[in-house]
Amino acid sequence: MSPRELVVLGTAGQAPTRTRNHNGYLLRWDGTSVLFDPGEGTQRQMLHAEVSAPRIERICVTHRHNDHCLGVPGVLNRMAQDGPGRPVTLHGPDDAFEHLRALAVVAAAHVEVTVEGIPVRDEPVEVARVAGARLSARALDHRVPTVGYRLEEPAGRSFDAAALADAGITGPDVGELQRRGELRGVRLADVSVERPGQVFGFVMDTRDHPAVVDLVRDADLAVLECTYSERHADLARDRGHLTARQAGRAAARAGVRTLVLAHFSQRYPDLEELAAEARAAVAELGGRTRVHLAHDLDVVPVPPRRSAPARAAS
């Protein structure tokens, strides 16, 4: 099975540093790839990370600020050079539609590109299906219209082999039972339990807002910006960003399994300060979220599936 993992291409905020490129986050998911917020220099980072450009199916932009989208032309050119690739869809808020279309035109790449605007609403808006999973977007609170993204796999079923055998359900009958819900007096619930689908959440520039928790609720893996430390909370609020403490608290409240901290201000020479702040916030709420401080070119696996609950005895 193809891996599900996040490739971190860049982690800087508004200004890159000697060791941190502008934004760029590539999610590998069941043989396809979704690229989030490619800032300037993403194409070069893809080479370092050995990312296959033709596998990119969608580019999802949270808002029109340059550090989140100026890498689009280079990525499209890389896809054309490394092809043959699949058609690519470029998603972003309605407010950014013309901006994104211009970036696609500037690329002048021989890649089939569709630009789709997303209504910015205070409720989930379905964007697309990715390998059977639902990709949705929801409004956040930044200085320009901004969305966060959520990729949610449908729940599946875990079958009890012994219960199937006892019920005489074998071979193609298992699939028939799953489709119909009942077969020869045997109910699906008698021989299986629901298995939660995996969830990925992506939240960039935003003030602390209830939508942050909703976007990453029960996420196996979530990327949250933490541009500032809590000691610069006033600056974070004024500029429309999260602090590390706010990111940690949101992840803990949402039940996130692994939190990837990213989008750091260049004012912090030692980013362990931000990681420690987020971990302390998780601990304060009694959360179990693992906090990962992102570095450029990190590869962070989506945690293994949650175990299905035990089937009740009949």
Curated annotation (Swiss-Prot):
Residues that coordinate or bind Zn(2+) 1:
63, 65, 142, 205
Q: EC annotation?
A: 3.1.26.11
Q: Which residues are responsible for catalysis?
A: 67
Q: Which GO terms describe its molecular function?
A: 3'-tRNA processing endoribonuclease activity; zinc ion binding
Keyword presence, Nuclease? yes
Q: Which SUPFAM superfamilies does the record associate with it?
A: Metallo-hydrolase/oxidoreductase
Q: Mind telling me which Pfam families this protein's record contains?
A: Lactamase_B_2
Matching CDD domains, A to Z?
A: RNaseZ_ZiPD-like_MBL-fold
Q: What InterPro entries does the annotation carry?
A: Metallo-B-lactamas (IPR001279), RibonucZ/Hydroxyglut_hydro (IPR036866), RNase_Z/BN (IPR013471)
Q: What does this protein do?
A: Zinc phosphodiesterase, which displays some tRNA 3'-processing endonuclease activity. Probably involved in tRNA maturation, by removing a 3'-trailer from precursor tRNA.
Instruction: Give the UniProt family note.
Output: Belongs to the RNase Z family.
Subunit structure, per the record? Homodimer.
Name of protein: Ribonuclease Z
Protein source organism: Kineococcus radiotolerans (strain ATCC BAA-149 / DSM 14245 / SRS30216)
Q: Which gene encodes it?
A: rnz
